[in-house]
């Protein structure tokens, strides 16, 4: 074995210092590796240059080392993973975005990047941006057939994405803490996730439901690891789980498939192990048994390599890095091991073929996986009695064609544009269904085309008997007012019943995995607005004339006239006093079942089974610790559910709100609003409801009082209507991203523009609390993207609002662009004090907002920063004005009077003095205000 560090391989800052590398992965063909680091970049390196390091330098001068550098992420890159088919590279970051990269074969590298000396010999472009996580992304993993990619993160969620279309299939929120690792079963049946809640959860790929929760090996495991990256053995038998405990000793737990028990612990590290990686190859030892090789690395900066045939490690290297090991990966041939560390170095270990034993062929690996159903398309051998029950249930459902139809067709409209031929096309069954089922019993709207159909689509043509009569096309002829005859053009081609081949599908590597999974329908309630917000329609906004079937000159003239009048038309569209019907939110989709837990705990759960009429009413069941506490029936379907420690609230599709106590008593008669509820949120004793027409309601349910008269969102949503053009149309109108109510009863709304508004019940108007302007211009803006604890989020709402703005800027990709524009602007003449002025204004706005919202902690903290800033910049008049205003107020906050706040500010002044001039001026202020 040889171990070497590559001096030129790393992520460096402007001064040449190494930056932490958090992830490393190798391409399936072994030609390149990818690294992701603290600088927010992904770098592609040539493995040929790495392998030739320390050889004749003259021969390697022209050999490219770094192939490409991608810097689209706005935060630290925590995970990089090539797809097994080699087409894509997936990267995750603490900017909460997953980016799918695709190598452009037809386009060469772009050479040097402007402003840097880095050369690019390959061109990797951002192919998809996957949004859905609410916090840092910690790990990614592809299924072995490249049909799925799963991301996990610090928001405790697991998101499953389609590996071809990259649409989100399902979001799973079963873990109770940060999810820090993910691995896929090579047989394609399961994937496993590891979390700081000290569990590993095994999930079925067929329906994304949980197979087993494993807790035993992780009791008292430390929560200090940055990652918990497990690995699945290539024969499918075992999972290597890092950060496990064997009594007081840290270890790696080996979990056996099927029983999901852990009888083997690998002990050899002094600190917690963060990452494990099985060699993708199997080896045969002297006793003719198949052997797996496992590499482990962690916080003790040591590397250990284990063989399943030996009780002790094959290799144990201590202090190979100066900091913890972040990621480990094996080359496809199983003879090279790559490690990266937080100290910014990459270690390469190369082995000889005989060191691990005789390497077995890929066919033998497939045979080892065959007993778990790998490679079987028609039928999969069941691994448990529960799977047999699921198959029998699926068979019973598919025997009833009507059972796959929508419960209420009036609530969920079906697409009318699907060709009849497409509806009748037989579809191949999913791999997890029994082989005895026929394709004719499956509703093609519920299942996607099989992999074979996608890989080789057929164009529509004549039938097999050759007697099909072609359809006669009839062109539409219209006569205008001027007597001119207009003939509408007719499309001669027809739509194919089979989806057309995409550029990506045509180049896919062939795998023996299951067919493409259909999008999943979730059973959880829509208790928050979607990440991208809900569509908003201002009544009367006609931004484009639809003249698909009318090509008359009059229609074209009307379009030109409308384009000229459009700007003035929007400026007077909405008045600030407008209430109903100016805004139209999309109502939540109908759900057959809704389950909502109180405060995300399973102790109190409300389950809703929706009906369709009075003959089939909606059933509501409240559970406490799994036992039925109370039950009720409603004649209308339920669309939203929320709850607090004081009450449950249920919204029906007829615009009614039903309020129950936790014991099931009705607190009030049903509250009627003017339209369906689009959003429902509660906090403590307060309930917030936003209707589909944009009306905002808020009540104190305990006191049974309204906080204010129903108010419209129109004033804050119509601000940019003057900027709407025919080209931009309604998609540029701002929409609501997040809405909530604080524990003090203050409603807040965050728009897609990054602005957050709160409604003041004393001023009776919407007030803007945060906006992107402060984020890009103020030095005191919190752009860390982290909230330290739940207690902090409860006591610092303004901090939450600023994080919302950060999230919107990062999701839209505008953050870096705006910061660069500001950085360029302040270098020009006349902008010397730009950042100082904007920072002072930001702090003043934050102080006023804290007083408005009665936030004592944030008011005091921001006031202290404000006082220090004014003193250091010599703005003594502003400082004296601020102290004088505080002194005159009898009640400056909930807990403190104005004089008490002034006393605290004087202490801050005394501590912040640095120069003699500041000392003299500060003493005068202290003497003036300390005596009053």
Curated annotation (Swiss-Prot):
- Composition bias (Polar residues) maps to 405-426, 441-453
> Biased composition, Low complexity: where in the chain?
498-507
The record's InterPro entries line, in alphabetical order, gives: CAF1B_HIR1_beta-prop, HIR1-like, HIRA-like_C, HIRA_B_motif, WD40/YVTN_repeat-like_dom_sf, WD40_repeat_dom_sf, WD40_rpt
Q: Which Pfam families match?
A: Beta-prop_CAF1B_HIR1, Hira, HIRA_B
Q: Which UniProt keywords apply?
A: Chromatin regulator, Cytoplasm, Nucleus, Repeat, Repressor, Transcription, Transcription regulation, WD repeat
The biological process GO terms on file are: chromatin organization; chromatin remodeling; regulation of DNA-templated transcription; transcription elongation-coupled chromatin remodeling
Location in the cell reads: Cytoplasm; Nucleus
List, alphabetically, the GO terms of the cellular component aspect: chromatin; cytosol; HIR complex; nucleus
**For this UniProt entry, what is the primary localization, expressed as one broad class?**
cytoplasm
Query: Which parts are the WD repeats?
Result: 16-55, 72-111, 132-171, 174-213, 222-265, 268-316, 320-361
Q: Does the keyword Transcription regulation apply?
A: yes
Q: Where is this region: Disordered?
A: 405-470, 498-520
Keyword Ligase attributed: no
Family the entry assigns: Belongs to the WD repeat HIR1 family.
PANTHER family annotated for this entry? MEMBER OF THE HIR1 FAMILY OF WD-REPEAT PROTEINS, PROTEIN HIRA
Q: How does it assemble?
A: Interacts with his3 and slm9.
Functional note: Probably required for replication-independent chromatin assembly. Required for transcriptional silencing in the outer repeat (otr) centromeric repeats and the Tf2 long terminal repeat retrotransposons. Repressor of histone gene transcription in G1 arrested cells. Required for repression of htb1 gene expression outside of S phase.
What protein name does the entry list?
Protein hir1
Species the sequence originates in: Schizosaccharomyces pombe (strain 972 / ATCC 24843) (Fission yeast)
Organism placement in taxonomy: Eukaryota, Fungi, Dikarya, Ascomycota, Taphrinomycotina
